[in-house]
A protein has these predicted regions:
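Conserved lysine of the Walker
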Residues: 39-40
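The conserved Walker
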Residues: 35
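Flexible beta-alpha connector loops of hexameric P-loop NTPases
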Residues: 4-5, 83-93, 111-118, 149-163, ...
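Phosphate-binding/switch region of NTP-binding enzymes
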Residues: 160-216
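Pre-Walker A (Motif I) flank of P-loop NTPase domains
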Residues: 24-29, 56
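N-terminal pre-Walker A segment at the start of P-loop NTPase domains
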Residues: 1-18
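Cytosolic-facing regulatory segments adjacent to core modules
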Residues: 18, 49-136, 150
Length: 216
């Protein structure tokens, strides 16, 4: 259904949605950054907005964190409480009440997490098809692209393998007719450039493959 005039899946971030009109069917969307710059946190915030606020089913493939770690991060995001405080139970009465209230919102939210380590792009395609067929998933999220592999194929370099993965994800988005969001690492080049403008990421900074900027 149309969400606030958007034609695609809303992110919950008005400025971004105004620019994109939501993520469109068959889109491959890349969220890129250097390590520890908040890519996963941003993706989880979007996941919360999509699944909890809009009740749109999503599939989240986490190659970096296991299921427990990811759920803890999601709870922290939804409740706006430090994950460390939640893990240690160091909450005041107001925070306990907020945790209880927000967990009720989160319980039953259509978020389907797969934390299979070392997932190949071919395994992901099989799992994604099943999620769309059985759960009605409308958005796939992958954390993160460079942790995937293309087992069963031979490549002259890692760059060629990542290019194949990127093209496969774009093909999957088109086949399933849903947006696929993949997190991606940036190369060190962005850190080696001088000045504020020099630190601004460029498409050429996408790590291990120039194909990502063409497919997304």
């Amino acid at each position: 259904s149309n969400k606030g005039g958007l034609t695609g899946i809303p992110t919950g971030y008005r400025g971004l949605d105004d620019i994109t009109s939501g993520w469109q069917p068959s889109d491959l969307v890349i969220i890129a950054g250097r390590p520890a710059m908040g890519k996963t946190s941003f993706a989880l915030s979007i996941a919360k907005n999509v699944a909890v606020d809009y009740h749109i089913p999503i599939g989240f493939f986490s190659l970096e964190m296991n299921n427990v770690q990811l759920v803890n991060r999601l709870i922290s995001n939804v409740c706006e409480i430090s994950g460390h405080k939640i893990l240690n139970g160091q909450l005041d009465n107001t925070e306990w009440e907020r945790l209880d209230r927000k967990l009720r919102d989160l319980t039953g939210a259509p978020i389907y997490v797969d934390d299979t380590p070392g997932l190949s792009v071919f395994e992901l395609r099989t799992k994604a098809r099943r999620l769309v067929r059985e759960k009605g998933v409308k958005l796939l999220m992958i954390d993160y692209l460079q942790l995937m592999n293309a087992n069963g194929m031979k490549f002259g370099s890692r760059q060629e393998e990542v290019s194949t993965i990127s093209r496969s994800l774009k093909g999957l988005a088109k086949e399933l007719n849903i947006p696929v969001l993949a997190l991606s690492q940036l190369s060190r080049n962005v850190e080696n450039r001088e000045g504020l403008e020099g630190k601004r990421p460029q498409l050429s900074d996408l790590r291990e493959s120039g194909a990502i900027e063409q497919d997304a």
